[in-house]
From Swiss-Prot:
Binding residues annotated for NADP(+), in chain numbering: G167, A168, S169, I192, I233
UniProtKB keywords: Amino-acid biosynthesis, Histidine biosynthesis, Hydrolase, Methionine biosynthesis, Multifunctional enzyme, NADP, One-carbon metabolism, Oxidoreductase, Purine biosynthesis
InterPro entries recorded: Aminoacid_DH-like_N_sf, NAD(P)-bd_dom_sf, THF_DH/CycHdrlase, THF_DH/CycHdrlase_cat_dom, THF_DH/CycHdrlase_CS, THF_DH/CycHdrlase_NAD-bd_dom
Assembly and interaction partners: Homodimer.
Biological processes per GO annotation: L-histidine biosynthetic process; methionine biosynthetic process; purine nucleotide biosynthetic process; tetrahydrofolate interconversion
Reactions listed under catalytic activity: (6R)-5,10-methylene-5,6,7,8-tetrahydrofolate + NADP(+) = (6R)-5,10-methenyltetrahydrofolate + NADPH; (6R)-5,10-methenyltetrahydrofolate + H2O = (6R)-10-formyltetrahydrofolate + H(+)
Gene Ontology CC annotation, any one: cytosol
Pathway: One-carbon metabolism; tetrahydrofolate interconversion
Name of protein: Bifunctional protein FolD 1
Organism: Pseudomonas putida (strain ATCC 47054 / DSM 6125 / CFBP 8728 / NCIMB 11950 / KT2440)
Amino acid sequence: MTAQLIDGKALAAQVRQEVEEGVAAFIADGWAAPGLAVVLVGCDAASQVYVENKIRQTEAVGMRSERFLLPADTDESQLLTLIEQLNNNDAIHGILVQFPLPPQIDVSRVISAIHPSKDVDGFNPLNVGRLAAGLEGGLTPCTPLGVMRLIRSVHPDIAGMGALVVGASNVVGRPLARLLLQADCTVSIAHIRTTDLARRCREADILVVATGVPGLIRGDYIKPGATVIDVGISRVRLPNGRDKLTGDVAFEEAVEVAGAITPVPGGVGPMTIAYLLANTLQAARAAVRLR
């Protein structure tokens, strides 16, 4: 068996097209283009590339973007002041603070300072609580939304299927488990300290792995025909001295067992940014409904 490759780039392009059409309709209704503010503290090279990619894609779908580049020695109060200004700016519908932040800044305070209605990352405690309670109206983390779209591209109806999420972070694992549960999956959560992880993986119809441990899930961990979504991405050094991007799943082994699988790169990553755009449009629509 050779697994179907789930093309995250193609699906992300579909999401961006949907957002672009939604933005055009929003503007045609007489509203200003949705606005996304992106805040970067420091000069981490990888973060700068990621921010520029987000801004480029934001503008490509017809939304406005504003970047705020702050020095690495910015203190917490300065960042919180900027966030408050953005909270009060009606032209800004989404606020994204690029992580990681310098050590002098408390990440949890920053997340809580972003108004829930503009929290396009979906990390504010109020949005987390809405998702946990199954309430509508909140913003959901982008990567879990992207993972659900990837899964539904293979299984439009996942009710009754068994899903295992390996990884219990607040960014991916926990919110994703909630979304799967809302879709009537039978959901379990595991992590790197779970005993007998291989057995638990082999019971799953849908296996999502988000641990940041390269090659954690071997081919013999996978139920034949299962759908495997690899959220992890790590840079590993090969014997020849070159670097390679790899996921949490041993791809060459897994592709011979799974029914469908995401590649790394080109699987989950493009979907995360696509749903950042979708969340920004959702936030803009919600804002005008309140006027």
